[in-house]
Amino acid sequence: MKRISRGKFEKMQQLSNDHGVIAALAIDQRGSMKKMMQTAVGEEKFSMDQVYEFKELVSQELTKHVSAILLDEQYGFKGIKAKDPNCGLIMSYEKTGYDANTPGRLPELLPDESLDRLLAKGADAAKVLVYYDPDEAQEILDVKHAFLERLGTEALAVDIPVFVEPIVYDSKIT
């Protein structure tokens, strides 16, 4: 039987509601959110402050009604500070997007972060998005599998839950 550490259990409780359900609000979009807001207000009227304020307001108003919020620190730093103190925090740990010139949509972690640093910033868990095509070349799949193994080892070392967000795609369709 698999066992969960006390630290992970306590963090999972912080992320869960009274029924043991993780009812999380996800607003960790970065590049796509910036593009949507630029389109909505127009290039000439757009500023990054609008993105920061949007995430702050959403966090401030909605974290009273959810058990956890998923935010990125890059654009969501104000939202992290504005969240309800009873709401758990899941922080994005991957770089946004992928290099379209490199086959495989390989995952990359934020270069200046670690799970230990996310914990120090108040995270109860981390999230990593991984693009996955099971029919891709074995060399690419091996890189992704090794990436996830290293991520699991790091999570075990600092006793933090990590959620993997798999995005399944077909590399033959662009």
Where are these regions (language model features)?
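Conserved anion-binding
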Residues: 130-137, 144-174
